[in-house]
Amino acid sequence: MFGMVPFRRNNNGLMRREDFFDKMFDNFFSDDFFPTTTFNGNAGFKVDIKEDDDKYTVAADLPGVKKDNIELQYENNYLTINAKRDDIVETKDDNNNFVRRERSYGELRRSFYVDNIDDSKIDASFLDGVLRITLPKKVKGKDNGRRIDIH
């Protein structure tokens, strides 16, 4: 009605709706098993964060990632999750020749600001592609400080 079409590429750098969907379908149908849009660093990975009275619980979906390729760090009130994925799918015929060989590599990082955490009690587990992190809160009213000796 007013000529406003989302995803239109003019000289202003916006993409036309048709180009957006054409590219999406081209990428989808040309990449059999490892779509690049799911683990390329731009899309990120999905994270659920739940707050309870005494803790935060984080669940991060990391499909295709091995436990050894996950690094978890809590520093300066930031929880940082680093994950790498290196997948190789090989299919050979009876003569040991490759019929298909595909590789998929990706690296992701996400950081979250979470304060009032008892960092000595942070716990994490990884099962079935889901990283679960428990971040206990500091106890209210308890002296959470420590004495600092002067040398």
UniProtKB/Swiss-Prot annotation:
Keyword Oxidoreductase assigned: no
Every sHSP domain range: 38-151
InterPro entries: A-crystallin/Hsp20_dom, HSP20-like_chaperone, sHSP/HSP20, Small_HSP
SUPFAM superfamilies from the UniProt entry: HSP20-like chaperones
Keywords: Chaperone, Stress response
Induction: By stress; by heat shock and also at the onset of solventogenesis.
Family to which this protein belongs: Belongs to the small heat shock protein (HSP20) family.
Free-text function comment from the UniProt entry: Probable chaperone.
Name assigned to this protein: 18 kDa heat shock protein
Species name: Clostridium acetobutylicum (strain ATCC 824 / DSM 792 / JCM 1419 / IAM 19013 / LMG 5710 / NBRC 13948 / NRRL B-527 / VKM B-1787 / 2291 / W)
Gene responsible for this protein: hsp18
